[in-house]
Structure formats: structure tokens, C-alpha cells
Amino acid sequence: MNQRAPSKYGTQVIKPDDFDIFWGELLERSHNIPLNASLTLDSMRTTEQVEVFEVHYDSLNSLRVVGWYCLPRLKPRPLPARVFYPGYISEPTLPKAHAEQGYATFGAAPRGKLRSNLQFNPGYPGLLTHNLVDRQSYAYQGFYLDAIRVIDFLTEQPEVDSERIGIQGSSQGGALTLVAAALRPQVKAASAGAPYLTGVVDAIDLTRTYPYEEINDYLRLHPQYRDAMVKTWNYYDCINFADRIQCPIIVYIGLQDDVCPPETAYPLMDKIQSPEKKLYAYDGHGHDANHHVHDQVVDTFFDNHLKT
């Protein structure tokens, strides 16, 4: 069915010489911020099988970020853990079903998402272009760090086996998965679907679909900022994080995806350094990336890497 040749496309993304220095400094800043994590039992959502907690923790620029933390009541400790990162227009999940399968689970809500949007809310559309031409204050800086601090939270929980943490998400959640896998070696397995924020300078030429069209809208209004936008994005593009990913990882895409073009996944896979990596490319599928079938592949992947 596919008439494109996404595996032949390549990328225009360039990794800045000071990329590792830039992120090293940000990680140090983040490390120096105490988590100050608090857990509040959610009695309404707690069941006989799963305890549900609303978690609050501190992140960059003193923002208090929120997430859902689910624990199976009857499974032996310490538990393997799975983190679920949200998409761009979707809200955080409450992953009780996976907790019932024997995992400690965390539904992340980085700044701007539900329950973390009173502190920071550029709206939709808006996050993608918020301070787009300034790498030091670009919106995704805090967003990425909020996401990786979930890993820090989990490693501090006595009921979690810090050697068995997996992370996952699709679209923007796939991007956050890639960044967290790159910046947190505690991650032992990762699954990224239809990864967003990957090959961004390529994607804005390949699609006219939102959210990427937000950037094209911005550049139509401010064409003089294109070079500055590209320079900023090179510090945030997932392709430039990929060579730091060492854990087992699966990536899945739809070959007819007009939201996150499949062409951007191939240079990403080329850069990932993990000795155990696999790309699933589904013909006949768009941004859904065949997740209704692939979800079982993901569950099996995590069971194999985190439960054995």
C-alpha cells in the first residue's frame, strides 16, 4: 500500500557541538532540585486490586508537577515499574490495568498537561512554539526534565525495583520515552510509538498536519526566525539524543502517518546505540501505528525484560 520510500529519506538534523554540555548543565540543575515528592491516596479510584495515588513533585523553575501512581495490592515486592508518557493533545493516563498485571505504574503529567497546567499552560496550539527561538527558555526544556524526574521518583520508592524500570508512550509520549531513555541510564527497557519531536526540520517539510504545522504557521508570521528556530530545535530533537540510548528499545510507526512522518524514524533508528533495538513499520496505518495490535507486542516486550 505504501507509495513513499521513508527508509531512503535521511535527515537535515545537525547535532550541536555543545549538545552534551548543554544537557549536562541542565541535568545538574535538575539534580540539585529536591523532589519533595508527596503521595496522596485517591480513595475514589483505588480498588481492591490497585492503590491509586496522586503524586506531586518539584521540577525545573520551582514548578510543582503531578502524576498518577498505581500499585498492585497483592503482588510481591519489590515491583517492576512502567512509566506512561502522554501525547501532545491527549491527557495523562491512569494506568490501573497494567498495575493489575504486577507493575508499579506511573501516568506522567508534565507541565501544561492536566493537573500540571495551572502552573504552566501555553495552551493548544502553543507548547511547540512557546519561546521557540531561545534554547535556554524553550518550553520543552522543562517538559523534558519533568518527564525524566519521574524516573528519579520511582528509584526513591522502596516498593520499586530500580533495576526493572520501563518507559513507554506514543507520539509526544514516544518522544519523552526517547529522551528519558537517553538521559536516565536507570531505564532498562523502552517502547516508543510514532515518535514526535523527531527530525523536526524534516517533518515540517513533509507534513502540513498539526501539531508540526504550528511551526510552519509561526514561520509564516516570523520568517526571519527560521535559522534561530532550527538552532534551538537541534538541542531538543530526539535524533540528537538517540546515540545515548543503550537499553533495549522497540519503536513502531505507521507508514501512512501524516502527523509524525515515518521518514523521521529511520535516521532515529540509525543513531540509537542499543544492541537490542527493533523498528516495527506497519503499512496501511497512520498515526495510530497499529497500536491496537502492537500493544500486545509492547506488553510482551516489557514482561520479557522486566519480569524475568
Locate the predicted segments by residue:
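N-terminal targeting or regulatory segments adjacent to alpha/beta-hydrolase or S9 domains
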Residues: 1-50, 308
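Short beta-strand element of the alpha/beta-hydrolase
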Residues: 67-73, 77-88
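Cap/lid segment of the alpha/beta-hydrolase catalytic domain
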Residues: 93-145, 202-203, 209
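Histidine-bearing beta->alpha loop at or near hydrolase active sites
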Residues: 279-290, 297, 301
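Hydrolase active-site cap/lid region
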Residues: 178-224
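Short beta-strand/loop motif that positions the catalytic acidic residue
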Residues: 245, 251-253, 257
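Gly/Ser-rich "nucleophile elbow"/oxyanion-hole loop immediately N-terminal to the catalytic nucleophile
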Residues: 128-171
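Acidic catalytic loop of the alpha/beta-hydrolase fold
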Residues: 255-260, 288
